[in-house]
Amino acid sequence: SFKGGYLASGNYYLTEDITLASIIQINAGSDVKICLNGKSINTEDVTGYDYTIRNYGTLTLNNCDTANGIINTYSFTFLCYNNSVLYGNAAIYSPMEVKGRSKISGCTLNNHITCSANSEITGGTFLDRTYIHNSAVISGGTFNQEVKVFDSGVITGGYFSKAISSYNGNFIKGGYFKTKPDDSYIADGYAITASGNSNYPYKVVALHTCNGVTYDKPLDSSFKGGYLASGNYYLTEDI
């Protein structure tokens, strides 16, 4: 019987597939958790709306039956705006726009995503193209298709299977890469080095210079000991 509307803070779960007749909206300050429970939210019947799911608050989309159930909104865009946050493990099949200092920290996106206006991707799996611009940041997540960076977008972390493309240089400050990034994309004070990860053999790290020697192999608290190959290492925290 649920066909759309405003969702107040709370923990919701689907008991059957839903086809929306109007938008779903989560207002600023609301904390909404939805478990798809192996069911789908469809939007084929929604007309007259550019965005059919609008998140202005904190939205967690989970699915305890990942073999079934998706956000099935192929023809309409999922909007995250105005300091909103998206978490979860659900599969989303709509294009997504992320604006206004919002954050994507989970879910699997099967369509393209555009991230702008000081927003950030910190996690999630991205199976189609990703576009970042207007001071947007990628600091985490797994990207299986091309990532395009415009104007002031920045990459500080994440795992990238395909090539990065950009009209501007000096924007990569971290991350793991299957394909070696173009040297012109690496920010000043950073370098491409071997990652030790066979799936993502290249990583970008900050350089450290001391007494005229440049160090390009950071060690953090995850290092607990072992054999060290030839190289210049520096500590980023106590070990």
Give the predicted meaning of each segment.
Residues 10-32, 36-45, 90, 143, ...:
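N-terminal extracellular ligand-recognition/capping segment immediately after the signal peptide
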